Amino acid sequence: MSNAVKKTGVKKVVLAYSGGLDTSAIIPWLKETYDDCEIIAFCADVGQGEEELVGLTEKALASGASECHIVDLKEEFVADYIYPTIATGAIYEGTYLLGTSMARPIIAKAQVEVARKVGADAVCHGCTGKGNDQVRFEGCFAALAPDLKVIAPWREWEMRSREDLLAYLAERDIKTSASATKIYSRDANAWHISHEGGELEDPWNEPSKGVWTLTVAPEDAPNEPEYVSLAVKHGRVTHVNDEALSPYAALMKLNDIAGKHGVGRIDITENRLVGMKSRGCYETPGGTVMFAGLRAIEELVLDKTSRTWREQIAGQMSHLVYDGRWFTPLCKSLIAASESLAESVNGDVVIKLYKGQATAVKKRSPNSLYSESFATFGEDDVYDQKHAEGFIRLYSLASRIRALNTK
């Protein structure tokens, strides 16, 4: 590969770098493929864990990068990407809380910002040609920086397996901690961790205990429930168990609490954007609790038409996020409308955690539309039940006319 005629036209490229096997191989490949090309490594800290960042700069430089930029995006990710998404009620195909999908636009945006800062003329990612992420990243690049060249090595090089990558690095004396026996492909951030590959590729195989990393097995969770209280302001959690916390810190605390009770596991076969189906196991402990809490308060404060509208756009928003269309006018509009509704989502909620379940058992709100005096079956001075007769006649008028016309 190093003896091939080198390409020209790219002098400086910013690579989305994780330190894993793929991106470790991409750095020398870029240097060998493009003539006189400088590689800038970029890593987005979206809450994947401190252990993932230790030694990252040294590893990037040893692989041939001239610089490594690690950008802390944790608070911005939760505040400006997670909360706007869950405000719309978006859940992909009724189950998936979009953990990987939500992280891609902020990573792409930060990558473009680094590219502008260092004067790069190209960006590069390590996504495979079979997955969703290539579309998400490149869709964001197109929206934010259409002038930058996009390099996708997995669609260009001849390597096809982990063994190929390991041999490639060994030939160049580039050290890696990866091995050919890696079982699962994982992607982690503050919201969740995903698991794919290995025995999971056969949907008849039950996930082994070794798959899960954030949550205990529900059957092994404590035999006594735990109650966690959330204070919510404008659709965002501000306090956990009466402790004021930043958006990111609140999510981390809930991840820890809920994970101990086996909350937030799903095992799904989803429809990928590129046309194929894939199986994934996801853990979203804190996010599951947040979602349950916010939905409980919404039940108190949103009227029927508002909730109906929100349910209608939830599916559309889930596809926009999943398909990498974050930086589009429609996505921006749906978020703005949903956050307007969230202005009244204020109050307190108590979530019961028990063996994999997160259930809202107490809720209150200063904006509540629920009235015990209205809802009671007892006598009251507010609602005259006789008024229902006229309403019902008008409400059923079309049905009445249709029936008369068919006689």
Swiss-Prot record:
Family in the record: Belongs to the argininosuccinate synthase family. Type 1 subfamily.
A GO BP entry: urea cycle
NCBIfam families: argG (TIGR00032), PRK00509.1 (NF001770)
GO CC terms in record: cytoplasm
Binding site residues for ATP: A16, Y17, S18, G19, G20, L21, D22, T23, S24, A44, G126
Protein name according to UniProt: Argininosuccinate synthase
Subunit structure: Homotetramer.
Family matches, as PANTHER family: ARGININOSUCCINATE SYNTHASE
One Pfam family linked to the record: Arginosuc_syn_C
Native organism: Shewanella frigidimarina (strain NCIMB 400)
Top-level taxon in the UniProt lineage: Bacteria
Keywords associated with the record: Amino-acid biosynthesis, Arginine biosynthesis, ATP-binding, Cytoplasm, Ligase, Nucleotide-binding
Gene Ontology terms for molecular function: argininosuccinate synthase activity; ATP binding
InterPro entries named in the record: Arginosuc_syn_C (IPR048268), Arginosuc_syn_N (IPR048267), Arginosuc_synth (IPR001518), Arginosuc_synth_CS (IPR018223), Arginosuc_synth_type_1_subfam (IPR023434), AS_cat/multimer_dom_body (IPR024074), Rossmann-like_a/b/a_fold (IPR014729)
Positions with a binding annotation for L-citrulline: Y96, S101, N132, R136, S185, S194, E270, Y282
Subcellular location: Cytoplasm
Catalytic activity, as annotated: L-citrulline + L-aspartate + ATP = 2-(N(omega)-L-arginino)succinate + AMP + diphosphate + H(+)
Keyword Cytoplasm: yes
EC number(s) per entry: 6.3.4.5
Pathway(s) it belongs to: Amino-acid biosynthesis; L-arginine biosynthesis; L-arginine from L-ornithine and carbamoyl phosphate: step 2/3
Primary subcellular site in the record, as a coarse category: cytoplasm
Binding site for L-aspartate: T128, N132, D133
